[in-house]
Amino acid sequence: MNKAKNSGAVPQFVDNFEDFYNNGDDILNNKHKEEINFVKYRIFDTHLINYNNNNNNKNNNNNNNNNENTTITNKLNEIKEYLILNYIKDYIWQKEPFNLKIYDHKKKQQQQQQLPIHFYGNTKFEESIDDEWFIVYILLELTKKFQSLIVSIKDNDGEFILIETAQALPKWIKPTNSNNRVYLKNGEIHIIPLPSDPSQLDTIPYKMDTNTALSILSSSSNNIITKVSNEINEILKNRLKRFYNGEYFLKDQNQIKLAAIPIEIGYLLNQYPQLISDITTTFYNRDSDDMKTISTMKRFPMSRERDSFGNSGQLITTNIRFTRCLYAMLKLQQWNSPKNFHPQLPKPSHPTYDSRSLGVKIICGLEMVYNRSKRNSVSSYHRFNDDLNWLNYLKQLKSNNYFNDETIGSKLYKEKLLIAKNQYLKNNINNNNNNNNKEEESIYKLIDQVTNSKSVDEMIKILQESDKSKIESEDDWLNEENPDKFEDLITEFENDRQKQQQKQQQQQQQQQQNKEGKKEVKENNNNNNNNNNNNNNNNNNNNNNNNNNNNDSNLINDFSNQFKSMLSQLSSFDGVEFNEKSGNSKNKTKSSAYGNGGDDNISFDSNKFMDILKGFTDNNKYDDDYDDDDDDDDDMYQDIDNYEDSDDKDDDEDDENDEDDEDDGFEEYEDEDEDDDDEKEFQYVEFLKKSTIKQYMERMDQELNLKIIASSFELESTKLPKEFDDIEKSNNNNNNNINNNDKDVDEDDNENYKVNQKVDLNLNLVKNLLESLTEQQGFAGPASTLLKEMSDNNSKKREKKKTSSKKLIPKKGKVKENK
């Protein structure tokens, strides 16, 4: 009890964590529909591992086993004592506290991978993600204190540290190859790389296991670099800066508010501040059974007289410590006090309304916690959802129809389930003779013991002394509705990303300058090159003056080309990466075929390879000189031949039908139309057989241009030939003298010319994007996203052009001196 009191937390213990660590995702997802946020961690001590291996090599006896157990237990107690005294003594956890247990590797020999001796734990943090990062913080500090420790930590999303530092990670790191490669050591992140060549596969396997990873991290003889860059560590430290500078403990962990509660409850929360977490979460997630207990209020009746439990019924306004998350959950709950409460709540405008309302919620929450603990009795501390043996036992009960097809959650189902849980725990206690974890006192017994441990006067004195050191906190942060803060966070993230990109560009520029400095270039060649550059610059200036007249058309063409180049970028399932042109690939560091990279290793330039392939395909596509189409091998032409054969049969049938039609007295012009259709159809088939793919596509375009769909595209704005201008003039001047047949001929000529007009792809692209932007009405959408990516890509190119132009300045100076 004293240890729990000093740690500021109700004792909470977990069984079978080693099974839950490996199978926790499946257990939690199958047991609960909603996702449960949890973090799981393992602490390996290289000294303990070596000590255990040495004992295994010797003859095993009872003395060695006892010494080994003593050493492991002492190390665990040393770690716990350090963490409690320096970090978690007064920490209020949202759901579950940080906890460590010894991994009994001797009982896990049936597993495929036998892990070495270590300590492990699991913590559910639910709404408060700060608990997760606080655990990362204390584990980092723990590895600084004990440099023999190596820590692995994951959550329900996997390697969440990699997710946090994703913007600075090497390109080779993927979710599929990062398993068992990420660890904390000496207060920093360590990532075991992939093998850089096949000779390293023995020491660095592609599929990493825990034992191999520990041997790599603990060995100083190998040349494997596992320490990540300073940039990655800085991102993690920036995420944990609230813990390092103490801001989190002063504000988020220390929300002090006045509450009018019974004296006994005030004293209870003063001695065990962690209970406020159980009170808040139980009140927040209350069910129908909890609401029934509120209607009676048997344990904490709000009356003026002393009850059977010894409660005085006197209220005291005292300072209660919350976390900001817990206070927000309790404060924002709409709740009216029950009718049996005395006295009733004042009006919201009353000065004491906030303290009275908060006190009523605390009283009701504690009543729920007390009765829920008493209902569960002996099973209150056992976490059945995390016990694989219990889950298997429950499956057997269901298969034997123990619940008699009762609905889950019904009263009879709960009664049977409670009986099964109690019987399961009793069997475990009887079967485990060497059980060192004795059954702890349940919460309701703890509440009874603490509230009756001192007199009312003594409790009042303790509360008054405690209130002197507590200053009530403001809750203005709870009512903030300033959207600018969210924008500030986004801009801060963007600024950090831009700074990192600038650092990378500066490093690349320095590497290029170093390479250029090593090259020796003759002065004559430099002078000639400089003269040529000057001439080229003059020519470029003249060309720029000539191009100013066509700014409008160039803007559209440039926009279209940028859009096309953006869409032509290679994308993987990780997203689009805007790579530079293939000409710059020479300046990039060579990446290894195995992903890790090296100077002397076999390299594979994927960008250059794709450019070569793209060049082949571009040269062969729509080539006018390529006339070697093999019609026989093309399925389309086989279909045409089959179509022609069927046409011959149809023609014979049509001839017979035509004879019948003549006998029936059909008119001649109908027969002529049918003959024309047959002739056109025959010509079309002949055209398909003799034409190439390109001609076939052009013919299809001509047919589509005659349809309605042609009006939906913008055509190129070219001037009509002189013949059409003359036709239009003659139509205007001699409109009354021209017959209708001539008009039809002119209109057909105009239509034929329009059919041959090309679609202005650039103008259509700009038009469609502008229409899409107007439809977005200022909100985010696909068009704005594409334009943003284009602007980012162009800004990078401009910066590179500026840097390249700056490098030419000293060369021009040399030319002037030589002249």
UniProtKB/Swiss-Prot annotation:
Pfam families: SGT1. This is Protein ecdysoneless homolog. Belongs to the ECD family. Residues 501-514, 524-551, 581-592, 730-740 have a biased composition (Low complexity). Keywords: Activator, Transcription, Transcription regulation. May act as a transcriptional activator. Residues 797-819 have a biased composition (Basic residues). The keyword Transcription applies. Residues 624-680 have a biased composition (Acidic residues). One of its GO terms (cellular component) is nucleus. InterPro entries: Ecd (IPR010770). It comes from Dictyostelium discoideum (Social amoeba). Residues 494-558, 578-603, 617-680, 725-749, 778-819 are annotated as: Disordered.
